[in-house]
């Protein structure tokens, strides 16, 4: 049931970040998306009644147990390091633009 819920959530928005409110790596990724002007859906696992079940389902689905767990256009991107690396390589904005999360006139990278 948690896996179905996770997949449904990922399909419901161009960008989904599974997060924990106290996690500094999660804050960093969400701040980057905000700086880029990207719209995203953040699911705070520590605020969800089934948060631990969702985190286990995400680990089963993606092989990643840690947060943040980032999805763009339904595709698993990874965590904080993966997302920052895509940004540093100039690949994040095109992914976000293709997903419809930002307008195509946005900056190409933000130094985090």
Swiss-Prot record:
Q: Which SUPFAM superfamilies match?
A: Thioredoxin-like
The set of disulfide-linked cysteines is 23-26
GO cellular component: a single term: cytoplasm
Its subcellular locations are: Cytoplasm
Question: From the UniProt record, which GO molecular function terms apply?
Answer: glutathione disulfide oxidoreductase activity
* Source superkingdom: Eukaryota
> Cross-referenced Gene3D superfamilies, in alphabetical order?
Glutaredoxin (3.40.30.10)
Q: Which PROSITE patterns match?
A: GLUTAREDOXIN_1 (PS00195), GLUTAREDOXIN_2 (PS51354)
Residues in domain Glutaredoxin?
A: 3-103
Coarse class of the protein's main subcellular location: cytoplasm
Q: Which residues form a coiled coil?
A: none
Q: In which tissues is it expressed?
A: Expressed in aleurone layer.
Per the record's keyword annotation, is Electron transport included, yes or no?
A: yes
Which example biological process does GO assign this protein?
cellular response to oxidative stress
Fill in the PTM field for this protein: The N-terminus is blocked.
Alphabetical UniProt keywords:
Cytoplasm, Disulfide bond, Electron transport, Redox-active center, Transport
What this chain does, per the entry, is described as: Has a glutathione-disulfide oxidoreductase activity in the presence of NADPH and glutathione reductase. Reduces low molecular weight disulfides and proteins. Possesses thioltransferase, dehydroascorbate reductase and GSH-dependent peroxidase activities in vitro.
Per the similarity annotation, which family is this?
Belongs to the glutaredoxin family. CPYC subfamily.
**PANTHER family listed in its UniProt record:** GLUTAREDOXIN 2, GLUTAREDOXIN-C6
Any further remarks?
The mutagenesis of Cys-26 into a serine residue does not affect thioltransferase and GSH-dependent peroxidase activities.
Name it.
Glutaredoxin-C6
Q: Which organism is it from?
A: Oryza sativa subsp. japonica (Rice)
Origin organism lineage: Eukaryota, Viridiplantae, Streptophyta, Embryophyta, Tracheophyta
């Amino acid at each position: 049931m948690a896996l179905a819920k996770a997949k449904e959530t990922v399909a419901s928005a161009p960008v989904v970040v599974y997060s924990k409110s106290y996690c500094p790596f999660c804050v960093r990724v969400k701040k980057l998306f905000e700086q880029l002007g990207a719209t995203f859906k953040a699911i705070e696992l520590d605020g969800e009644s089934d948060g631990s079940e969702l985190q286990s389902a995400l680990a089963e689905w993606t092989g990643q147990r840690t947060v943040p767990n980032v999805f763009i256009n339904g595709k698993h991107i990874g965590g904080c390091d993966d997302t920052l690396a895509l940004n540093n390589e100039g690949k994040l904005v095109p992914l976000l633009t293709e997903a419809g999360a930002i307008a195509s006139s946005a900056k190409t990278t933000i130094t985090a």
